[in-house]
């Protein structure tokens, strides 16, 4: 459950390290985001000399949440951290590598490029 002011780790090599959520995209007054939702974020930490700078406003897709996700077969999945991957306006990842596992729900939401770059899909 990702909401406004939530801090997210960045799971790619775009240059950002920490993000703070400004808004969850979708719906009318959508309060919470989960895996596969797009969020507008502010970069709070970034590595030097990277494409992304501290204070930049970026779009990202949530790939991991600490709050469990219920699947249609009745199983639940949760991760150790809240993480996102930066995306451009065409929903393609800005980085070239993805770190850590991502949820299978991304495939259903249409983020096939992120799923193909990820080392593990749970």
UniProtKB/Swiss-Prot annotation:
PROSITE patterns according to UniProt: RIBOSOMAL_L14
Domain of life: Bacteria
Gene Ontology terms, MF aspect: large ribosomal subunit rRNA binding; structural constituent of ribosome
Keywords noted in UniProt: Ribonucleoprotein, Ribosomal protein, RNA-binding, rRNA-binding
A biological-process GO annotation: translation
CDD domains recorded: Ribosomal_uL14
InterPro entries registered for this protein in UniProt: Ribosomal_uL14, Ribosomal_uL14_bac-type, Ribosomal_uL14_CS, Ribosomal_uL14_sf
Keyword rRNA-binding: yes
Record function comment: Binds to 23S rRNA. Forms part of two intersubunit bridges in the 70S ribosome.
PANTHER family xrefs: 50S/60S RIBOSOMAL PROTEIN L14/L23, LARGE RIBOSOMAL SUBUNIT PROTEIN UL14M
NCBIfam families: rplN_bact
Family statement: Belongs to the universal ribosomal protein uL14 family.
SUBUNIT field: Part of the 50S ribosomal subunit. Forms a cluster with proteins L3 and L19. In the 70S ribosome, L14 and L19 interact and together make contacts with the 16S rRNA in bridges B5 and B8.
Protein name: Large ribosomal subunit protein uL14
Organism the protein comes from: Thermotoga petrophila (strain ATCC BAA-488 / DSM 13995 / JCM 10881 / RKU-1)
